[in-house]
Design a protein with these regions (language model features):
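Sec/Tat signal peptide C-region and signal peptidase I cleavage site
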Residues: 20-26
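Extra-cytoplasmic beta-strand recognition segments
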Residues: 35, 82-107, 138, 148, ...
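Extracellular glycan-recognition surfaces and repeat-rich motifs
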Residues: 36-72
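Extracellular beta-rich ligand/substrate-recognition surface
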Residues: 71-83, 126-129
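Beta-strand acidic-aromatic groove motif in beta-rich domains, primarily in extracellular
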Residues: 107-116
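Extracellular carbohydrate recognition and processing domains
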Residues: 118-145
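Short beta-strand-plus-loop segments that form exposed binding edges in beta-rich domains
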Residues: 150-157
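A short, hydrophobic C-terminal helix/tail in secreted or cell-surface proteins
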Residues: 175-195
């Protein structure tokens, strides 16, 4: 019986470690965050949205999308800001990574700002990344229903935006059904081992 107890304890420890292992494939809560549809579908566009579009390949100072992606957004409203926003459902109290890639050339006047639930997390005036893609990352807390948005203006030319994402911080993932299946299979297999041991 002592052998049976030890085997049960060991198997449960292994199975539970599998069940509660962090999910390394974080899901993006945004729709069309990489502008992969070639449009702004999934996004809400508002205010001055003149000269703002989704493009592919080389465009003005930019050689293409971030990381080789096909499409990216170019932002060029004149005189006043345009706004690009999206709402999503998440888990209240959980931590989320809000990230995006941005490129600009220091046009004057120009401005770019990013918001989480209406609170600015980034505000830039005449930003200049040398037309190179630069990643910005922020950690925020979910409320159950949240939103992100960008305000932007570039009178002379364009700024660029790509690969926008909101993902849950790893280590908080609720066990998936497949993990519960692994647990059940492990326990059932243990039962067979114990029975064979006890017959000897």
């Amino acid at each position: 019986m002592r052998l049976k107890t030890l085997l049960v304890a060991a198997a449960l420890a292994v199975c539970l470690s599998i069940v509660y292992a962090p999910n390394t494939f974080a899901q993006n809560l945004l729709t069309n965050g990489n502008f992969g549809t070639g449009t702004f579908s999934g996004w809400t566009t508002s205010n001055n949205f003149e000269d703002t579009e989704v493009v592919s390949g080389a465009f003005y100072d930019y050689s293409g999308g971030q990381g080789g992606s096909t499409y990216y957004a170019v932002l060029g409203p004149v005189g006043t800001d345009g706004t690009l926003s999206q709402s999503f459902t998440d888990t209240s109290g959980a931590s989320y990574t809000f990230s995006f890639w941005f490129a600009s050339v220091g046009d004057n006047p120009s401005d770019f700002s990013a918001y989480w639930d209406g609170t600015a997390v980034l505000s830039l005036t005449n930003p200049n990344t040398g037309a190179n893609w630069t990643e910005y990352t922020f950690t925020e807390t979910g409320t159950g229903h949240d939103s992100i948005s960008f305000n932007f203006r570039d009178d002379p030319e364009y700024m660029a935006l790509d690969n926008v994402s909101v993902t849950e911080v790893s280590g908080q993932t609720v066990p998936e059904p497949s993990s519960w299946l692994l647990l059940g299979t492990g326990v059932l297999g243990l039962g067979g081992i114990v029975r064979r041991k006890l017959r000897r």
